[in-house]
Curated annotation (Swiss-Prot):
Gene: rho
Protein name in the entry: Transcription termination factor Rho
Pfam families, A to Z: ATP-synt_ab (PF00006), Rho_N (PF07498), Rho_RNA_bind (PF07497)
Assembly and interaction partners: Homohexamer. The homohexamer assembles into an open ring structure.
EC number in record: 3.6.4.-
Enzyme class, broadest EC rank: hydrolase
One Gene Ontology MF term: ATP-dependent activity, acting on RNA
Species per Swiss-Prot/TrEMBL record: Neisseria gonorrhoeae
Keywords noted in UniProt: ATP-binding, Helicase, Hydrolase, Nucleotide-binding, RNA-binding, Transcription, Transcription regulation, Transcription termination
């Protein structure tokens, strides 16, 4: 049996299982403690268990397999990985491991990994010859992630508008700049749906930092990818740990030549968390940002790249503006030049209830000629020239109207030519 089968069960089902196996006071247990107790009882009765998880190596040299279901939070049902296994198989933090486990001995607190079956979906021997992420060659994105789908829904409107205004490629470092309450989380959700529908082979991770718990539940129920979160009631150290684990996991996948997309909401709150946990340097920038605080979030964002040797890491992150906080403005200014695609959402457009509320003139992609065929690129530039003299609201209203009136983007350009 697989440990994750128990971890994904609802708490009521786990309580029934606990009763079957004679575990007393089970309703007083936290979910992770309950899983630990059930697995222990079943293994004592001779049941064999396999496990999978993402490795986190601690400073002491040993590691634990953390579960994505608990957003990589340390718990009693984590699987211990010995330093010998880590050295033998050349393991790193972020490796996704599958193997067999044994029950803890009398003086032990955790289940231990006894046999390693696969690393990141490949045979363990393959991992000995992989190239480290830091040694891979970064390139501009050359393959477009098309978000257009054969639908007449609101989310397809978002995807088609992005394809026309600022196309996204595999390996894009994209910044979605938005004031609060104008639909940036909904836009991220729409992008997630479109990526999973059009590119099922792409590994999608949605990372929610400092978000509301109900939004986390909604996102995890509607998105087919992995949703990892740290809610606003958790400490800054937890936000940082979750972000680091997601980044390391994505890097390991790229080393295995996979295409990975991370949707981060939001990089502003992640930078605030780093600002809280980083040791004080004594140099404070405007708005209360420590001079050393933005290095690690920049390292996170800077990891997005298209890789010459195969694979890519795409990061689409939201940045908050117009919050009334000087710190948020400083964080945005620091990240402004680092991305190679920006999508600006406008409060004035959103107040007119025009969604997606994209400010067309401010949004765009660097080196878009590498992503889009030349004939389509010429049409996109003509569209921009046509919309540029208009007011932002008028331009968005015109674009949204024409998208709704056409079946797809090719039909949209034919409609434009006819006009």
């Amino acid at each position: 049996m697989h440990v994750s089968e128990l971890q994904t069960l609802h708490i009521s089902k786990l309580l029934e299982l606990a009763e079957e196996h004679g575990i007393e006071n089970a309703n007083r247990f936290r979910k992770q403690d309950l899983v630990f107790a059930i697995v222990r009882q079943m293994m004592k009765k001779g049941e064999g268990f396999t496990c999978s998880g993402t490795l986190e190596i601690l400073p002491d040299g040993f590691g634990f397999l953390r579960s994505a279901d608990t957003s990589y939070l340390a718990g009693p049902d984590d699987i211990y990985v010995s330093p010998t296994q880590i050295r033998r198989f050349n393991l790193h933090t972020g490796d996704t491991i599958e193997g067999s486990v044994r029950v803890p001995k009398d003086n032990e607190r955790y289940f231990a990994l006894v046999r390693l079956d696969s690393i990141n979906g490949d045979h363990p021997e393959v991992c000995r010859h992989k190239i480290l992420f830091e040694n891979l060659t970064p390139l501009f994105p050359t393959e477009q992630l098309k978000l257009e789908r054969d639908l007449k829904s609101e989310e397809n409107l978002t995807g088609r508008a992005i394809d026309l205004i600022s196309p996204i490629g595999k390996g894009q470092r994209a910044l979605l700049v938005a004031p609060p309450k104008i639909g940036k989380t909904v836009m991220l959700e729409n992008i997630a749906h479109e990526v999973t529908a059009n590119y099922p082979e792409v590994e999608l991770i949605v990372l929610l930092i400092d978000e509301r718990p109900e939004e986390v539940t909604e996102m995890s129920r509607s998105v087919r990818g992995e949703v990892v979160s740290s809610t606003f009631d958790e400490p800054a150290q937890r936000h940082v740990q979750v972000a680091e684990m997601v980044l390391e996991k994505a890097k390991r996948m790229v080393e295995h030549k996979k295409d990975v997309v991370i949707l981060l909401d939001s990089i502003t709150r992640l930078a605030r968390a780093y600002n809280t946990v980083v040791p004080a340097s004594g140099k404070i920038l405007t708005g209360g940002v420590d001079a050393n605080a933005l290095h690690r979030p920049k390292r996170f964002f800077g990891a997005a790249r298209n890789v010459e040797e195969g694979g890519s890491l795409t990061i689409i992150a939201t940045a908050l503006v117009e919050t009334g906080s000087r710190m948020d403005d400083v964080i945005y200014e620091e990240f402004k030049g680092t991305g190679n695609m920006e999508l600006h959402l406008d409060r004035r457009i959103a107040e007119k209830r025009l969604f997606p509320a994209i400010n067309i003139n401010k949004s765009g992609t660097r080196r878009e000629e590498l992503l889009v065929p030349n004939d389509q690129l010429q049409r996109m530039w003509l569209l921009r020239k046509f919309l540029h003299p208009m007011d932002e609201i008028e331009a968005t209203e015109f674009l949204n109207g024409k998208i709704k009136a056409s079946k797809n983007n090719d039909d949209f350009f034919e409609l434009m030519r006819g006009k």
